[in-house]
């Protein structure tokens, strides 16, 4: 399965290759479906499943290492995944159709706008985080502690998911003739067929891997640092705002020259900066309190030890 899925990437580096040869090499089928054991499996759905499994494994390991309840993590994963998918789909509906079209389909009972398929990552991220906060608050568990162990897994899962987008031909880039441009032959994902398309999905996947590594390094000595949530919001907000300029799929929802995702990215950046500063202050106060308590107990233990030790004989 891995060689089949990676075949579209076989000439990511075309340095020293003629442009015509590069074009011919890149005219490969992008595998919107992968045949396994006689079954035709959508590559997008397969990569989404792999992304979820990878995120669960990383989060489970980190949760166990932090001494948190792993059973609560599994319940949390199911809740956030379900709510996240719903939020991702709803945001797709709102950026694809006007409010009048949505309301009209509800009034006439056809619900036609809800019969189309599509997902927008930001919708899933926002609703998923909110649903996780509600669950942990009801359970009287620390949202920040669980966020610290779970959040680094999000960009990893997102990176794998974007490979699924690349294989399926959705979330595609602008039509531009570059050495790494790809040529889609199957219109099922919505990408234009037979023209050079910038592989923005792979670029975003690489950026998400970088964010994943940064978050792992940041939490190496701060395993329960809730500020990692805001650091992720800041990093991904900047990443997504910039990469949106290279996107060409129609689900953009342009307003005042910026896409819906860019407006959300601006909010994410502000949220990340403010939240990170406040969270770091909170963590510093907690660490200071713990250090003060530790320093107060040390003299007490020394006094007890000296009282119990035999006196010097002169």
Spell out what each predicted region is.
Residues 26-314:
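A feature for loop-to-transmembrane-helix boundaries and adjacent hydrophobic helices
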Residues 1-3, 10-29:
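Short, Lys/Arg-enriched N-terminal segments with co-localized hydrophobic residues
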Residues 6-9, 308:
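Compositionally biased, low-complexity intrinsically disordered regions
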